[in-house]
Structures are given as structure tokens and as C-alpha cells.
């Protein structure tokens, strides 16, 4: 194996020969990253992406100044879905090293799971991977139930069954209970609900290739909340939390759902399907009904739900929606502590009525008269949260996945959001 390239940190500017804006320089001893105090974590991440671009696949983080956050920033930029990389980590105290190791184990799991081809990651595989990850960190403090196929229809999970029935791979609901108290009557502190569409063709409202080619990542919300629960457990979560993953393919077949179909949910809501490519909200509705039944203090759902959120925020921020200002403020404070990008977008009472249908209580998509697509999608979901004005957060995961590399990230999944949700759960 080639000798590791040493990477050191300096608060001094680079030699003038490297240019006045140089963020790194190279010498006989290795590569030096020149921190300026303005955005040191971002600088380290961008430099790591450049180092990987140079073809350097074996590095040693050396010298003073490295801590868990800086090591993690380097790894976020250095990691990529293709090829192998090796990092020799610096000496850290036990707590910092444990924090880094947990990030590497869990957030890399999130990134790798989202990057997995749809052919190898179907609904059942996604649910089982989630069980395996959380069982690994929680042991016997976790129990779970997997419901699939026709059992979903018989038990009233009509949104999930309707969306997933067009695929040969059965739709799946994972209901997982992390209960560190061991008391079956212990109150549920929080419920996490994730959209797990393992491939989204758009159904009969079919996507163009340019919009379908990244749709293996449409289960990013499910992976994110799974990782968040696992990470919170490693940080000492001592409250009962339930996880609901709504997993399905959205494909075309003779058995696939069609425009004009009407879905009747367990809470009595009837929804007319006018766009089969607005399927995420249809499966999440089932998970939110289950979450509401637990009477938790908070419900957090996460989904790669709308293109409108990406139009507003790009892939740089997750979009946050809530009627609960105090809870939204707590999540944004957690995001600031974890250095993760979240931005709150509007959600008002009138968004709940901007999905009119001539044949049902709700339409599953907005019209040209109501163009705020991310907000109306959140408004749709609110109809399936019993007390939607308090204790509910909706995250439209626009920062989950990048189709092309940028200066801080390789192509593929980012893992952003895991630490923020875990922080909120353990605050």
C-alpha cells in the first residue's frame, strides 16, 4: 500500500506563490490546509473534495487542531460512492473518537443505503436494513413489526398498498419501537415517519429520464430518520421513540394505480389521485395516522417529497414546515448546533385547502391556481396528523442527494439531517 499523504492544519495563510486565496498548499511533508476562521469546516470539506480529485486515496490527518467535527468535515468531502479511500485518524480523546466512530458507522450507512441501486434495495430490503442498523445499536431495547403486500390492504393501509401494488416487489410498512424503559405502558416521546419509495418512475404520470435517473434515492427520508434514531441512541437517547417506514416502488403495470382513483384512509379521509407522481404523500399519510395514534409529544416526518422545495432551496438546505413555531425553532437550533443546513418555508392554514377535488375530500396534487407545491404538499400531510398545529414537523429532504458533484460533495447522498434530528430527540 502507498504511504499515506499527511494532511495538516494551519492558521497561517499559504505562501504567496499559491495565490492569495489558496486554501491548501503542498510541500515535501504533505498537504497543509490553511484555515481563516470564517468557515473552517466548509474549507476543510472543500479541500478534501479537491484532494480526492487529485487521486489521493490514502491520507493521514496529522498534527494539531483536529477534533471530531474537523475530521468529520474532511470525511464528508473525501468520501465518494466509487472507489475506496483510507484515512488514518488523529489521536482524539475517548469521547471525541466515539462520536466520530458513530458518525462514520451510521451516517455512512445512510449515504450508502441511499446510493444503493434500486435493483438491490427494494421495500423489504430497506425495512430489513433499518431493523439491522437499529438493532445493532439498541440490542434488546427494540421490537418491530413488518407488514407487507395484501396484509396492508386488509389492515387498512390503503395509501401504501395502492402506490406499491404495481410492483412485483410488495410494499412494506416497518413499525419499530425503541423502548429503553422496558415498560410496555411507557409513553411514546416521539414518532419518526419516513418515505421509503425505493424507486419512483412516476407511475402513469411518468417522469422524463432526466427526472427519473436519480429516483433510487427517493427513499432518502426513510434512511434519514432511521439514521437519526440510531444516532440518537448512540448519544444516550433514554425515551421511547417509534419509527414508521412506508416503503414501496412506484411503477407502471396492469395493476398500478391510475389517475382518478380514490383512496379511503383509516381516518376517513378520501383522496382523489390526479397525479401518480405525487405518491410520497399518499404513503406517508398511512405512517402519520399510525404516529398520531401513539399520542407522542412530537411527530417528525422526512421525505424527498417535492421538486418545489429543491427549486426554492436547491440541494443546499432541507426544507422545514410546521405550524408549531416553538418546535420549529428547536429544530433550527439543533441544526445550528450540528452545523447542518435547514430553512423554514411557509405553511399556513390556507395551504390545507389548496388541494380541491370534485370527487373526494382532497386531491393529491395542487393545480396551477395554487403553485406553492412544497407548502401544499405539507398542507396535504397535515390532514393525517391528529393535532397538526402542535408537535409536528415536516422535513422535505431537498439536501439528501446530489446528481452531480460540487465543490463540497461528491455525487450521491449527503447524510445531512441525521445529526439534527438526533440532536432534537436527545435535547
UniProtKB/Swiss-Prot annotation:
Binding site for Mn(2+) 1: 200, 277, 279
Catalytic activity: Release of an N-terminal amino acid, Xaa, from a peptide or arylamide. Xaa is preferably Glu or Asp but may be other amino acids, including Leu, Met, His, Cys and Gln
Enzyme kind, highest EC tier: hydrolase
Localization, UniProt: Cytoplasm
Entry's Gene Ontology BP terms: peptide catabolic process; proteolysis
Bound cofactor: record note: Binds 2 manganese ions per subunit.
Predominant localisation class: cytoplasm
Gene3D superfamilies named in the record: Zn peptidases
Cofactor: Mn(2+)
CDD domains tied to this protein: Peptidase_M17 (cd00433)
Recorded phenotype for the gene knockout or disruption: A quadruple peptidase disruption (pepA, pepB, pepD and pepN) does not grow in M9 minimal medium, grows better when supplemented with casamino acids.
Function: Probably plays an important role in intracellular peptide degradation.
Complex and partners: Homohexamer.
Protein name: Peptidase B
Species of origin: Escherichia coli (strain K12)
